[in-house]
Amino acid sequence: MDLAYLPSPSTGVLHLGPIPLRAYAFCIILGVFAAVWLGNRRWVARGGKQGVIADVTLWAVPFGLVGGRLYHVFTSPDAYFGERGEPVRALYVWEGGLGIWGAIALGAVGAWIGCRRHRIPLPAFADAVAPGIVLAQAIGRWGNWFNQELYGRPTTLPWGLEIDRAHRPAGTLDIATYHPTFLYESLWNIGVAALILWAAKRFPLGHGRTFALYVAAYTVGRFGTEYLRIDEAHTFLGLRLNNWTSVLVFLGAVACLVVSAHRHPGIENVARLQGAGADGRTDDPRPADASVGLASGPPGNSTPRRATESWNVRNRS
């Protein structure tokens, strides 16, 4: 008998009065709101306009949901198109199954459309929302807890997650507790968000480098949690497909960090970028100050004015 363990919820449905709501969907919605809130604070702290982050998010989220679902279905086709699969269930997003890589890839397309409409560069937007995205992932992982899915190998550790017999793998029906990989990844993602906010205050992480830092840091943790998972997945050379994806994406993110730092040192002046066009670029060579991190509110008029005066001096010289 296990003396200590983490229990699983008895149901995956929350009731808001008479309205039933899938807990998985609720976690996603809550994560989106958190991402918009934090992204807006960072954008405004750098001189950006209120509402821009929310407007662009209205484009990014639908694209991201479609991309995340497509990635999940394409990488786990047997569950929907196999011998016992039900193709129509590929549309049941509320039951769980969103691949982060597909969500980021197609979500970026939606964000690009939104950024074009507001005439701002996509990298500047991505840098602003990077810690919010990983915070949203931390919240969204709790949807897996409600669904009793994507857990890890059996374990006898005190924090092992108890899984109902109906949700256990066929080969381990008599084993009750498993690694709570949802919790591991959620805690890791909170740490990544904190790392980004800290780094943004101390280094000039502009031109997409903040977003690249998020991707690189996230993939390290994802590789570890993916290694513990036991749900069915395609493998290559002994590693799950998502492990290989993590390795490739990590290398790409590190390359982006290095190349961007060499070609575009400094950070964009968001106040001047708005309205200058999606291809406009104005750099501030100084490291980002505290206002680029988790600022307490909108900036005063002094920050944009100092940046403009500095730009004028450089042009007169």
Swiss-Prot record:
Localization annotation: Cell membrane
Membrane-spanning segments: 19-39, 51-71, 93-113, 120-140, 180-200, 211-230, 241-261
Compositionally skewed regions (Polar residues) per UniProt: 299-317
InterPro entries from the UniProt entry: Lgt
GO cellular component: plasma membrane
Keywords tagged on the record: Cell membrane, Membrane, Transferase, Transmembrane, Transmembrane helix
Pathway: Protein modification; lipoprotein biosynthesis (diacylglyceryl transfer)
GO molecular function, one term: phosphatidylglycerol-prolipoprotein diacylglyceryl transferase activity
Membrane topology qualifier: Multi-pass membrane protein
Entry superkingdom: Bacteria
Region of interest (Disordered), ranges: 275-317
PANTHER family for this protein: PHOSPHATIDYLGLYCEROL--PROLIPOPROTEIN DIACYLGLYCERYL TRANSFERASE, PROLIPOPROTEIN DIACYLGLYCERYL TRANSFERASE
NCBIfam families: lgt
Family, similarity comment: Belongs to the Lgt family.
HAMAP family per record: Lgt
Annotated protein name in UniProt: Phosphatidylglycerol--prolipoprotein diacylglyceryl transferase 2
Lineage: Bacteria, Bacillati, Actinomycetota, Actinomycetes, Kitasatosporales
